[in-house]
């Protein structure tokens, strides 16, 4: 390919991608402003960045970090810790914190990724899994990369305690769920069982839109990972 052809190809690709990049810039600017506004509202100061030795029951910086995340993600409360070694660890904490023996967990977005299957324990035996704990499990296969909306009515019943919605594609080839997708799916779950807890796995989904799942009326709880979007590649764990 000659230089002029390469130049023309580059200009064509840049022109076609310009709208998408402009949208990304808008989202980044919106979320930057939202975080800064939240930091001002929480009155974050230098004192909150001080190192704590851990010899106390309270930690001013830790408490403010929780408050800040709750405000940014429009949640009632937030728990942000580097002691969570990964997103899977955070997700497992939610599941084990809510579910009890005899409860039913349903995955609305098909089979979760491998590390979550180890936590659940139904695809293969694993020590300390939800299955071993006595939690029942079922999953709704995706249809051509999309959530089976009619299937939600069948799989979510009166005994379903928690419905898991995985936003990212994980290791599959399906498209990730948009905020509008999550809005529609969570509303359908609540229509099938108003008492079912809607839990969104938001790993890789933080700050990619101007609305977070916890801002939606039918999403009850969400978990993500500091080592992905929020940490910007800087957080060692979380």
Segment roles from a protein language model:
Residues 2-18, 25, 35-41, 45-48, ...:
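Conserved PLP-enzyme active-site core in the AAT-like
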Residues 79-80, 138:
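Structural signal for short hydrophobic segments within the conserved structured cores
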């Amino acid at each position: 390919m000659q230089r002029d052809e390469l130049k023309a190809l580059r200009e064509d690709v840049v022109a076609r991608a310009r709208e998408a990049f402009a949208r990304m810039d808008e989202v980044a600017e919106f979320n930057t402003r939202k975080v800064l506004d939240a930091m001002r509202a929480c009155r974050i100061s230098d004192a909150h960045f001080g190192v704590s030795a851990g010899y106390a029951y309270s930690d001013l910086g830790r408490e403010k970090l929780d408050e800040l995340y709750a405000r940014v993600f429009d949640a009632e409360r937030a728990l942000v810790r580097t002691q969570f070694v990964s997103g899977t660890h955070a997700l497992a904490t939610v599941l084990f914190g809510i579910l009890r023996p005899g409860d039913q967990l349903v995955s609305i977005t098909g089979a979760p990724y491998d590390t979550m299957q180890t936590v659940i324990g139904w695809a293969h035996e694993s020590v300390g899994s939800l299955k071993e704990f006595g939690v029942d499990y079922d999953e709704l296969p995706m249809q051509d990369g999309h959530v089976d909306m009619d299937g939600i009515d069948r799989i979510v019943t009166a005994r379903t305690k928690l419905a898991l919605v995985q936003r990212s594609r994980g290791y599959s080839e399906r498209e990730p769920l948009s905020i509008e997708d999550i809005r529609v799916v969570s509303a359908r779950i609540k229509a099938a069982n108003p008492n079912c807890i809607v839990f969104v796995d938001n790993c890789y989904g933080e700050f990619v839109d101007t609305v977070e799942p916890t801002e939606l009326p039918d999403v009850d709880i969400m978990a993500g990972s500091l080592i992905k979007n929020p940490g910007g590649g800087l957080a060692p764990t979380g």
